[in-house]
Swiss-Prot record:
Keywords: Menaquinone biosynthesis, Methyltransferase, S-adenosyl-L-methionine, Transferase. Pathway: Quinol/quinone metabolism; menaquinone biosynthesis; menaquinol from 1,4-dihydroxy-2-naphthoate: step 2/2. Coiled coil: none annotated. The gene is menG. Its EC number is 2.1.1.163. This is Demethylmenaquinone methyltransferase. Methyltransferase required for the conversion of demethylmenaquinol (DMKH2) to menaquinol (MKH2). The lineage of its organism: Bacteria, Bacillati, Actinomycetota, Actinomycetes, Mycobacteriales. One of its GO terms (biological process) is methylation. It is an enzyme of class 2 (transferase). NCBIfam families: MenG_MenH_UbiE, PRK00216.1-2. It comes from the Bacteria. It catalyses: a 2-demethylmenaquinol + S-adenosyl-L-methionine = a menaquinol + S-adenosyl-L-homocysteine + H(+). Transmembrane segments: none annotated.
């Protein structure tokens, strides 16, 4: 799978991530110029979690993001539909569950907070995933979506586009076990909704008080919202 069609086959996407699992974390750090660490810390801060909270880290991959969240003292579970990615993170001692974002294997209202980092783009029906995340979150609970987005400066956006389509695939060929997956990455980022459009989708899925904050000039955006209390 090398094209960012929005009717993604979940089996193809899972297989693609299985194929990059072994060197996934290293590749991400290289391609992001080390910014991935900053984005993970910012996500943890935006979730506003602490001891006693139950947190779902969806599309957690190798669970490197889950370990960051667990620094808050919260109980965190890593969920991903790529068994290969979860297996690659076997040394990270957090709870891991294989599951589809549109059919989560959890009861209603069980998590105090849910987050998904760089995974919503890869879900065949991301609106359904947003609704499913709301289902498993308690009323008043918080969602934070960390995802690639649209740079706020036109000049920066032009430079970034060139990096995505030209430099990124070349770097990926040097460090990744499956460079074709990063062609998909670049194209899926370009096809993804901008900050305002994603906020609107979150609101439509039932999340309230949705706001976003740009990171690294808008290359990444953190979108946050709450599950409404019952009336």
């Amino acid at each position: 799978m090398s094209r960012a069609a929005l009717d993604k086959d979940p089996r193809d996407v899972a297989s693609m991530f299985d194929g990059v699992a072994r060197r996934y974390d290293l590749t991400n750090t290289v391609l992001s110029l080390g910014q991935d660490r900053y984005w993970r810390r910012a996500t943890r801060s935006a979730l506003r979690i602490g001891p006693g909270d139950k947190v779902l880290d969806l599309a957690a991959g190798t669970a490197v993001s889950t370990v960051e969240l667990a620094k808050s003292g919260a109980w965190c579970v890593a969920a991903d539909f790529s068994v290969g990615m979860l297996a690659a993170g076997h040394e990270r001692k957090v709870c891991k569950v294989a599951g589809d974002a549109t059919r989560l294997p959890f009861a209603d209202d069980v998590f105090d907070a849910v987050t998904i980092s760089f995974g919503l783009r890869n879900v065949v029906d991301f609106s359904a995933a947003l609704r499913e995340m709301a289902r498993v979150t308690r009323p008043g609970g918080r969602l934070v979506v960390c995802e690639f987005s649209t740079p706020v400066s036109a000049l920066f956006a032009t430079v970034y586009k060139e990096y995505l389509m030209r430099a990124l695939p070349r770097v990926a060929r040097a460090v990744s076990s499956n460079p074709e997956a990063y062609v998909y990455l670049a194209e899926s980022i370009r096809a993804w909704p901008d900050q305002a459009a994603l906020a609107q989708q979150m609101s439509r899925a039932g999340w309230s008080a949705v706001r976003w904050r740009n990171l690294t000039g808008g290359i990444v955006a953190l979108h946050a919202g709450y599950k409404p209390q019952p009336v």
